[in-house]
Design a protein with these regions (language model features):
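A conserved regulatory-domain signal marking ACT and ACT-like small-molecule sensing domains
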Residues: 1-91
Length: 91
C-alpha cells in the first residue's frame, strides 16, 4: 500500500508546549511523523511536519482538534494532504 502523506503547519508566538500539544494529537491517532522542521525567528514560532496519514480517511476531525489547540495556545495550525499543499504552493 502506498503511503498517503499530509503537511502540518504551525505559526504563532513562541511559547512552551507547542510541539508537545501538536505531537500529542498526532500520537493519539497513531500518526507517524516522517519529517519535521521548526524555527524560531525572534518571538515567532514556525513548524512544518510531513506525516503519514495512510490510515486516516478524513482530516476534518484532526483539523478540528488542531483548531481547538491553536485557539487555546495562540497558534495557527493546519493539516492538508500533501498533494493539496503542493498544488497551493506551486510557483
Amino acid at each position: 500500500m502506498e503511503k498517503r502523506r499530509a503537511v502540518v503547519s504551525v505559526i504563532g508566538k513562541d511559547q512552551v508546549g507547542i510541539i508537545a500539544g501538536v505531537t500529542k494529537i498526532l500520537a493519539d491517532h497513531y500518526i507517524n511523523i516522517l519529517d519535521i522542521r521548526q524555527t524560531i525567528l525572534q518571538d515567532f514560532f514556525t513548524m512544518m511536519m510531513v506525516v503519514d496519514v495512510t490510515d486516516i480517511e478524513n482530516l476534518d476531525g484532526l483539523q478540528k482538534q488542531f483548531d481547538e489547540l491553536g485557539g487555546a495556545i495562540g497558534q495557527q495550525i493546519n493539516i492538508q494532504r500533501e498533494e493539496i499543499f503542493q498544488t497551493m504552493h506551486r510557483i
